[in-house]
Amino acid sequence: MEKEWKKLIDEVENNRSYSSEPNFKFVDFIREKSTIEDKRAIVQEVERRIKLLMSMGLKNVIMTDRKGAIYEGREGLNPIKEEMAKITNFNKEKGTLAEVIKGADIFIGVSAPGTLTQDMVRTMAKDPIIFACANPVPEIFPDEAKAAGAAVVSTGRSDYPNQVNNVLCFPGLFRGVLDARASDVNDEMKVAAAYAIAGLVSDEELTAEYILPAAFDPRVKDAVAKAVAEAARKSGVARI
């Protein structure tokens, strides 16, 4: 784990803000008229994703590692965790994952198999959303999470609904970069890619087991490429 963090130190991006409004349709589907700003999220060691989510409106975030909640002043934090402690967990909540997850609306994990238990899910807010994306064995399997009360569950696996796979993003993102001859791949372009992917699931199609298109949906590449190229132009990094 420490080796992974050392590798990430060179990849820390500046936290930026956006004027565009996020469309978290799956959240609204589960909680009528709710907004992402109202939600409390527990995120396991995915610094870059946390910054992007926070820039899109998610405010109440607690980042955890194998020692529990990360908070400002915790001893033994490496530079990247010290940085994250300054912009997350403003109440300086302390404790293990099992302790800080109580009452949380969302869990996002890209960590290790079996780190989220059914007992933990039962202590979360009503109808929690679980992204258990460790591969090949997730933090918790979908059937276990749903039996414990989860409303929406995503994993990185193709044999379960709501697969989160980076193949949804990369082909179209790089096509958009090339089409715009972009000098950078900035956060605005990443956000645009996310919106484009989410937008391919219509309100009529949206269910708890279909919140994003399939990994090899032929519509995805072109939709993402168009959105990314446009975002590159609007953010000033396009060269054509």
State where each predicted segment sits.
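Residue-level detector of alpha-helical secondary structure
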Residues: E2, K6-I9, E13, F24-V27, ...
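Glycine-rich phosphate/diphosphate-binding loop of Rossmann-like nucleotide-binding domains
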Residues: E37, Q44-I108
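Adenosine-phosphate binding glycine-rich loop
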Residues: E37, A132-I240
